[in-house]
Regions:
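Metal-dependent amide/peptide-bond hydrolase catalytic core
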Residues: 1-148
């Protein structure tokens, strides 16, 4: 749960008549996402005179590990055949378009692209020396899947 945007007022010496807070919520499971969404929607004001409105809700399902394991194991086999080190895996609670595909029952792998760090930040970077092997892995995985 990360408060990512806050907008209020237009001068430093005036109490704003409106404040808007946007919150980014990511989760490893739909149950956790629903629990946090419910907790936020049931928040009560500390000041009885305060007026507030809570709108919105989650805009994508989580990418649950159970929906990715079979395809991950296949990618790990292909990586081993290419002589790559063992593929890592992580549940990150991220938000990609793959979340929708996985929720619809498709097998999804996320994170097969460039290797780097600082995702979505000003200091984001890509290790270009990894692009060739990552491309080879993706190419070999697609060929393996097409051979079924």
């Amino acid at each position: 749960v990360v408060p990512t945007m806050l907008r209020a007022g237009n001068t430093t010496n005036t109490v704003p008549d409106l404040a808007v807070l946007d919150i980014d919520i990511r989760s490893y499971s739909m149950d956790d996402l629903k629990r946090v969404d419910s907790a936020i929607k049931n928040l009560k004001a500390v000041n009885a005179d305060a007026r507030y409105e809570i709108t919105g809700g989650f805009n994508r399902p989580p990418l649950e590990t159970s929906s990715t394991m079979a395809l991950y194991e296949r990618a790990a086999k292909v990586a081993k055949e290419l002589g790559m080190p063992p593929l890592g895996h992580a549940s990150v609670g991220g938000a990609s378009d793959g979340n929708f595909a996985a929720a619809a029952g498709a097998q999804v792998l996320d994170g097969l692209g460039a290797i780097g760090g600082g995702a979505h930040a000003a200091h984001e970077w890509v290790d270009i020396s990894t692009l060739e092997i990552q491309s080879a892995l993706l190419n070999a995985l697609i060929k393996d899947l097409l051979n079924d």
